[in-house]
Amino acid sequence: MRAPFSPFRAADPAPPGTGLVVIPTGRARSNHAEVARSLGTAIIAGRFAAGAKLPGDGDLLATYRVSRPVLRESVKTLVAKGLLTTKARVGTVVRERAAWNMFDADVLAWHLEAGIDRRFLRDLAEIRLAVEPAAAALAAERRTPDDLAALEAGLARMRAAPSDSEGFSEGDLALHVAVAVASGNPFMRSIGGVIEVALRASFQLSAPVEPAERETTLAAHARIVAAIAARDPAAAAAAITEVIHNGLRRHGAAA
């Protein structure tokens, strides 16, 4: 009797020897979202190569124990995110990585669950370096009192929390998101998902942060807030660039 199809699941450890680090996201999901997550994570983890055909509906239905409409909705979700394509007389096929929507929040989260490596972190840092300094410069020019209050709140949360705590990382994330919001550019804000994944991955890989490193991190983030408060675009861009490079250095992904 044929064994049922069983994709690589995000809850499992990354395969040995891959150099990947799995970071659980702990997100609640509906049935169709859970199936999409499991299949999406399996694709990202390399369980299905580009050009490979997915198992038939019968195998997938037996594996996930969901209705056919739920399965179809899950596949549609993955098609919309660029991971799959449907071909007449062929079936459902995995697309090349270049076609994946890497700005999609689910696709980014599935990368964390599948297991990330240093190259992935460098890729994230490169897009951050292309966007965040510009966002910080715009924030220095356009910030409102409410924007400044949000920046200061994020920094205060970091200062109040131990460096290996969720509060520290959430404060860090809140500060960076506040920079994007303060830029006044909706496209800058939309990249928040990339920033969130980068920060969560960096924090997981580098935690616990040593006390001396904690002070360095706090001081660097304080310079971002101070530059935006002073309406100094060049200083704000330089400060956030320093923070991104420091993060790369901490987890060993610097070029």
Where are these regions (language model features)?
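Flexible, glycine- and charge-enriched loops at secondary-structure boundaries
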Residues: 25, 32, 144, 165, ...
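Cytosolic histidine kinase catalytic core of two-component systems
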Residues: 146, 186-187
